[in-house]
From Swiss-Prot:
On immunoreceptor stimulation, phosphorylated on C-terminal tyrosine residues. Phosphorylation on Tyr-351 is required for binding to the SH2 domain of NCK. Phosphorylation on both Tyr-276 and Tyr-304 is required for interaction with RASGAP. Phosphorylated on tyrosine residues by TEK/TIE2. DOK proteins are enzymatically inert adaptor or scaffolding proteins. They provide a docking platform for the assembly of multimolecular signaling complexes. DOK2 may modulate the cellular proliferation induced by IL-4, as well as IL-2 and IL-3. May be involved in modulating Bcr-Abl signaling. Attenuates EGF-stimulated MAP kinase activation. It comes from the Eukaryota. PTB domain mediates receptor interaction. Belongs to the DOK family. Type A subfamily. The gene is Dok2. This is Docking protein 2. Interacts with phosphorylated RASGAP and EGFR. Interacts with RET and NCK. Interacts (via PH domain) with TEK/TIE2 (tyrosine phosphorylated). Changing Y351F: No loss of binding to SH2 domain of RASGAP. Complete loss of binding to SH2 domain of NCK. Residues 250-304, 322-349, 366-412 are annotated as: Disordered. Highly expressed in spleen and lung. Coiled coil: none annotated. It comes from Mus musculus (Mouse). Gene3D superfamilies: Pleckstrin-homology domain (PH domain)/Phosphotyrosine-binding domain (PTB). InterPro entries: Docking_Protein_DOK (IPR050996), Dok1/2/3_PTB (IPR037751), IRS_PTB (IPR002404), PH-like_dom_sf (IPR011993), PH_domain (IPR001849).
Amino acid sequence: MVRMEEPAVKQGFLHLQQQQTFGKKWRRFAAVLYGESGCALARLELQDVPEKTRRGEATRKVVRLSDCLRVAEVGSEASSPRDTSAFILETKERLYLLAAPSAERSDWIQAICLLAFPGQRKGSPGLEEKSGSPCMEENELYSSSTTGLCKEYMVTIRPTEASERCRLRGSYTLRTGVSALELWGGPEPGTQLYDWPYRFLRRFGRDKATFSFEAGRRCLSGEGNFEFETRHGNEIFQALEKVIAVQKNATPSGPPSLPATGPMMPTVLPRPESPYSRPHDSLPSPSPGTLVPGMRPGAPEGEYAVPFDTVAHSLRKSFRGLLTGPPPHLPDPLYDSIQEDPGAPLPDHIYDEPEGVAALSLYDRTQRPSGETWREQATADGGPSSLQQDSSVPDWPQATEYDNVILKKGPK
């Protein structure tokens, strides 16, 4: 049977740490990384070097990348072989500790992540040319600037009051996550025991052999001091400073606010003003071009539609500058028609009112003298007796309606 050759995404040499009878030992493998195709899954194959293959001691391991949970760098505490750097590959079944040449470790991690997590693809020239999809680059402004800051360190717990309360003893993996400091370990691989959000850490420090921090009361572990024995206290300290600095400089996520295009309008609509909602003295005086509230154009005028005092007050204010003397005393409309004889003539006005303001009266029409009155007025050549007689005041009839008017009028 002829086996069809699949295109390899990446190949080279990797070291795998294996558990043996007398401890752990690094073993060198030829590694080949395959991508997903129509008849195969994405996987990492580890085969023995050609020397052992010729002796019949070949060993082949296959890691299915669809079961991969995480890929991360490991500090130098893993004591990897010379000129190599370690990284972990965790799946649902077990945790692999691998080592690649120091110059190639980041390339291996990036290639594995591209195949294991296809939703988080980064621009890879070799992979994009084979797949035929357009080359994509990651936007550094899109909340992924802390991806490269996540690192893991092997630490050993020092007994403190807080660690005893949390029942932490032995060796663990301390990871500087995106938003919290995480502690991984336990009987099952890939178990996160505790996390301490950066905003809840009161203080942290390090020396040559120790890294420590003080957790606040809002942390899941409660407040207290935690100390870890490690040779990489300075690296953990610097990584923690970087992540905190990135979070401080990050812009807050939220919907963009729309720029204001004009003055804000009140949300409550104004209520229609009623002529009885305020006292009469506080109402504004109507202008000549303004309709009185409650009146509609073309509507029949009612007898009590407009108060008389309001109209009179408005007219006095409008024509105050036109009148030469004080305004005439207007009679009270409630009492100006008492004991009025419809047939008797009304008294003449002392002052002329502006045109169009005064009401129509009977004396607006011209009248001719009646009877022989014109003869008496034309007699001008009479004697002194006649002049004296004409200038005298005739007797006033006793039953006249205007006696009260003559009596009320004072001397000028």
